[in-house]
Amino acid sequence: MPNIKEIVSRINSVHSTQQITKAMKMVAAAKLTKAQHQLLQLRPYAGGLSDILNHVIYSTEAELTKHYTQKRTIQRLMLVVISSDKGLCGSFNANIIKNTEAYINQFKDLLPTQIDILVIGKKALNFFQKKDYNLITTYTDLAGQLQFEDISEVASFIMDAFLNYTYDRVELIYNLFGSAASQFVQLEPFLPIVHPASPSHNNHVDYIYEPSKASLVETLIPMTLKIQLYKALLESAASEHGARMTTMSKATDNAEELLKSLRITYNKTRQAAITNEILEIAAGAEALSQ
């Protein structure tokens, strides 16, 4: 059985750790509130913009949109993998990495050199570097600020690579935010744009195009893709903060349970020590009386 000094030291250590996890939980909760607010504002805008784009693509001559919508035989594939820069967020990054590797393994006909990864986030970067995957470029510290201008540059790089036929397909892999306790890995087509089905008559809208349909398409498609990538990063950021808050909450609760157990052990050890001292005093007194 450990002595009282060791138990007290362990109690102090666990208590200090609990204070840290509790503080991290509160910080993550504050960041989650902010990220969730941004995400809830963007989702309707992104959805509305996507609906407009689908209508325009469906009603526009294929020649105007073919560079973005035309399916190609896959000779080169780009995966945009979005992870976090920091850890202590449960299985958040592990799920992204696991699903990315599973998706890559589906392309049996492609050589490893035909699949490139664009990594956003240090955690995925560290993993894929060790595994010798082809990393075309990496971005870190984006999630901390999440400025649309920075995301726009990343999206432009991806679009240029696709339009120049460097890649035949681009996919996004990120965590979709459900709630603080639930995140889901999302595999989302980015390019080519999936050609929409015929819009329903209930949602039919006749648009007036100014100055022309061609100029609108030229502006609308890149903007929609930039918003799509920006939304994916917001989803990932909210998921990260939610996962970290949940993880730190569990760690704080576990520390409390461990403290209870250590305090019981401390009391038992102290009681045993006191009992032994009383027995020794009684034995000494009896010896003296004889």
Curated annotation (Swiss-Prot):
Pfam families: ATP-synt. The keyword Cytoplasm does not apply. It comes from the Bacteria. It is a peripheral membrane protein. GO terms for molecular function: ATP binding; proton-transporting ATP synthase activity, rotational mechanism. Keywords: ATP synthesis, Cell inner membrane, Cell membrane, CF(1), Hydrogen ion transport, Ion transport, Membrane, Transport. Disulfide bonds: none annotated. GO terms for cellular component: plasma membrane; proton-transporting ATP synthase complex. Belongs to the ATPase gamma chain family. F-type ATPases have 2 components, CF(1) - the catalytic core - and CF(0) - the membrane proton channel. CF(1) has five subunits: alpha(3), beta(3), gamma(1), delta(1), epsilon(1). CF(0) has three main subunits: a, b and c. This is ATP synthase gamma chain.
